[in-house]
Amino acid sequence: MLTTLKPFGSVSVESKMNNKAGSFFWNLRQFSTLVSTSRTMRLCCLGLCKPKIVHSNWNILNNFHNRMQSTDIIRYLFQDAFIFKSDVGFQTKGISTLTALRIERLLYAKRLFFDSKQSLVPVDKSDDELKKVNLNHEVSNEDVLTKETKPNRISSRKLSEECNSLSDVLDAFSKAPTFPSSNYFTAMWTIAKRLSDDQKRFEKRLMFSHPAFNQLCEHMMREAKIMQYKYLLFSLHAIVKLGIPQNTILVQTLLRVTQERINECDEICLSVLSTVLEAMEPCKNVHVLRTGFRILVDQQVWKIEDVFTLQVVMKCIGKDAPIALKRKLEMKALRELDRFSVLNSQHMFEVLAAMNHRSLILLDECSKVVLDNIHGCPLRIMINILQSCKDLQYHNLDLFKGLADYVAATFDIWKFRKVLFILILFENLGFRPVGLMDLFMKRIVEDPESLNMKNILSILHTYSSLNHVYKCQNKEQFVEVMASALTGYLHTISSENLLDAVYSFCLMNYFPLAPFNQLLQKDIISELLTSDDMKNAYKLHTLDTCLKLDDTVYLRDIALSLPQLPRELPSSHTNAKVAEVLSSLLGGEGHFSKDVHLPHNYHIDFEIRMDTNRNQVLPLSDVDTTSATDIQRVAVLCVSRSAYCLGSSHPRGFLAMKMRHLNAMGFHVILVNNWEMDKLEMEDAVTFLKTKIYSVEALPVAAVNVQSTQ
């Protein structure tokens, strides 16, 4: 005889008397041990669960029917569950009953946010099968009331040790389900972490198609409101990591219950909840939960005792968190600084980068700990530190030198690709580790077979950007090996990758014939220009300039039809001060030109005309009457700190190429550092530029002394 589970509004008024939805789950478990059921779960389009329940072999108590009148309506009350007896009396088989169960909060459609069409769980089945979950319970009439048949509670750790696959865990659940269901999800995730990627994908497919998986998901939703909060969080984390989509009813229900019970969070739960939020993709329920999490952290931040928990919370708080909350967490971390372990100090860089908070005090103190314990530092830690420094724009020269010196000292134990990755990160920071780069060049020359297409491009970009091959002893060997390796990939390389490689060679003032000739083909040039990428146009302009100004006579000088590039904008603040200093030094603005645009899209901030010995400045009005052979053109460039390698006066690739090309156009180049000029008083600035502009022979003795102190 069928017993149908209907919405509460369809039963008698008397059944509405109890509104405690939480008690329903406890009674439902008790009821399920007394009644053997076969449930068919159907999901409507709103995501509301409407199960049909079939009861058979009713035997609640052997002598229960002896106490009932056959003509009366019997009501068996489990708070929210009512059983009405028909006029045929109680029977042990074939009883006709109607059970009205109320599901008010957990699965009520209006109380949940959904991003898209929902399903309980994702299964590789047809649409009809996705809407249906069959749950079967077989309980013996003789054993339902005996303690001996009650399954023993099993921990997730024991499950993960006894089972070898995800399906084994589900088999264990189907044989004897125990509370809480979170143990099964946690055990499956523990097992999945031990598997390879291919095994993990295969096991997940088996998990989704397992007959007991949907039953486990339903148990998880039923128990979400009554299990311990930490188990709820453990299960949510495991479910997300197992790859169950977030837009399923299961995940969204657990998110909603987690929101409702967030005040139960203790320090351990804060750590787990942080990990859960970090693993989840943005959605409405995640946003609401993250907002509640931030409020909770703001209230409990001073109560956090474990440093690791504090760092996990800080990492999860988000880049868009209120600045007041970030500063409060920073103050808490500073209070705990004496308790930081080496691992805590190493991890702090990544934590601050995750919350986009540049705390110089924390970074400086942690840098000291990292340097003091640099030996044995794993590559992963060094990569995280360098990447975080880039994100935070934190340039600690001592830290970078210490890391580079450690890698150079242990160079023989590092694999080729690991050293290259470290060098790429250093290039991103603008730092030039001379010793390490020399060792890496030597390895490339000795073992060119280790080069492939990807690392060829990375090496060329790194060395050209940092201008490292300039005046190196083995420059010729290095660039020849790189050119030879690139030539071997010309038949498979893409046009953009070829352009990147050739541009790097241009910066290094080296022009291998085969790559250049292939790039200069008209069809490849047209392909690069049709992409509407201004970077391609800029690099082609650079190539065209090198063909005209550098020593490339053996290459074909093709007239390239290139789009016009936007003009470079000068730094108005610094240029104004330099213009004032030049006017005071040279005797008026008639002795220099400002904002001069040259051929090949080059720009200089100031131009001065002098005699060939740079002893005398010539007024601009007298230049036309003087032979060009008697004039020395002086280009004054106002450059930023980023134009140099970090912590040095070594120019980076583009500035070095620009100086080379200006020299080819007949200019004597003077570099004026913006940050230094801003700090100088007018008198000191005049003296500084005087020593730069005039030759040593033309300076008075006092000026020479000033120059020697710079």
From Swiss-Prot:
Entry keyword annotation includes Thylakoid: no
A GO molecular-function annotation: RNA binding
Domain RAP intervals: 634-691
Positions of post-translational Phosphoserine modification: 126, 140, 708
Alphabetical keyword list: Disease variant, Mitochondrion, Mitochondrion nucleoid, Phosphoprotein, Primary mitochondrial disease, Ribosome biogenesis, RNA-binding, rRNA-binding, Transit peptide
SMART domains: RAP
InterPro entries: FAST_2, FAST_kinase, FAST_Leu-rich, RAP
Cellular component aspect of the GO annotation: mitochondrial matrix; mitochondrial nucleoid; mitochondrion; ribonucleoprotein granule
Listed GO biological process terms: apoptotic process; mitochondrial large ribosomal subunit assembly; mitochondrial RNA processing; mitochondrial translation; positive regulation of mitochondrial translation; regulation of mitochondrial mRNA stability; RNA processing
Pfam families (UniProt xref): FAST_1 (PF06743), FAST_2 (PF08368), RAP (PF08373)
Documented effect of changing residue 255 to P: In COXPD44; uncertain significance
Function text: Plays an important role in assembly of the mitochondrial large ribosomal subunit. As a component of a functional protein-RNA module, consisting of RCC1L, NGRN, RPUSD3, RPUSD4, TRUB2, FASTKD2 and 16S mitochondrial ribosomal RNA (16S mt-rRNA), controls 16S mt-rRNA abundance and is required for intra-mitochondrial translation. May play a role in mitochondrial apoptosis.
Complex and partners: Monomer. Found in a complex with GRSF1, DDX28, DHX30 and FASTKD5. Associates with the 16S mitochondrial rRNA (16S mt-rRNA). Forms a regulatory protein-RNA complex, consisting of RCC1L, NGRN, RPUSD3, RPUSD4, TRUB2, FASTKD2 and 16S mt-rRNA.
Descriptive protein name: FAST kinase domain-containing protein 2, mitochondrial
UniProt organism field: Homo sapiens
Gene this chain is encoded by: FASTKD2
